[in-house]
């Protein structure tokens, strides 16, 4: 794989992993419509690991306290664990089903329309007043289920989790903070699963230079994506991403029908 394609995929992975526009949907889109092969197991592994890095940097205070299970953040650690449970169950039981059922480009387009609708709905109907400390176990479970549904290409992981929090009345900062903290172990876990597959097939597919470059660009683009999304959330302009999802979704459906 040429270096510029590795850089491109790294940037796409970092941006779409955290912006509420569906990373899986865009990867399917670029693979099918632009002829870019994303079926590089080794690269996928390190792109996933690369996107964990900005979460660790931006939310380091929370991450450090969670890792060391500090008493003052024990409540947050438990909420993260509770949220991971339904995500893991859905991923283990239904990943192959959804991957086979919803892997067509046209269906990705329809799912992006759904993502846009949910983003728009959350911005218009939500009553943001709860802080993250007010989150209960059932709230975390609902967010975890929403994250699990993001295995459907075209459904955004960050979008679904943020929407799930907003529709339960949590403020924007709480929704974003919990979404990104919940994403880190899930993304890291997905990377470990892919690493197992890569080890079984061999790691000779790419040079270490390509792997390092792809990881760096995934981390850098992921960092700026998180910062930008936090800015958009605080400005109350989440509908920007809804319009984007609608436009891209309609374009995908039209192009899929033509070709």
From Swiss-Prot:
| Any single GO BP term | peptidoglycan biosynthetic process
Residue ranges spanning the membrane: these are 1-21, 40-60, 75-95, 101-121, 179-199, 206-226, 239-259
Topology versus the membrane, per the UniProt entry? Multi-pass membrane protein
* EC number annotated for this UniProt entry: 3.6.1.27
This protein's source sits in the domain of life called Bacteria
MF-aspect GO terms: undecaprenyl-diphosphatase activity
Known catalytic reactions: di-trans,octa-cis-undecaprenyl diphosphate + H2O = di-trans,octa-cis-undecaprenyl phosphate + phosphate + H(+)
Q: Top EC class per UniProt?
A: hydrolase
User: Where does it reside?
Assistant: Cell inner membrane
Keyword annotations for this protein, in alphabetical order, are: Antibiotic resistance, Cell inner membrane, Cell membrane, Cell shape, Cell wall biogenesis/degradation, Hydrolase, Membrane, Peptidoglycan synthesis, Transmembrane, Transmembrane helix
GO annotations of cellular component type: plasma membrane
Give start-end of the signal peptide: none
Listed as disulfide-bonded, the cysteine pairs are none
Q: Per its UniProt record, what HAMAP family does this chain match?
A: Undec_diphosphatase
Main function: Catalyzes the dephosphorylation of undecaprenyl diphosphate (UPP). Confers resistance to bacitracin.
Miscellaneous information on this protein: Bacitracin is thought to be involved in the inhibition of peptidoglycan synthesis by sequestering undecaprenyl diphosphate, thereby reducing the pool of lipid carrier available.
PANTHER family, per the entry:
UNDECAPRENYL-DIPHOSPHATASE
The record's family statement is: Belongs to the UppP family.
Note the NCBIfam families from the entry: undec_PP_bacA
Return the protein name.
Undecaprenyl-diphosphatase
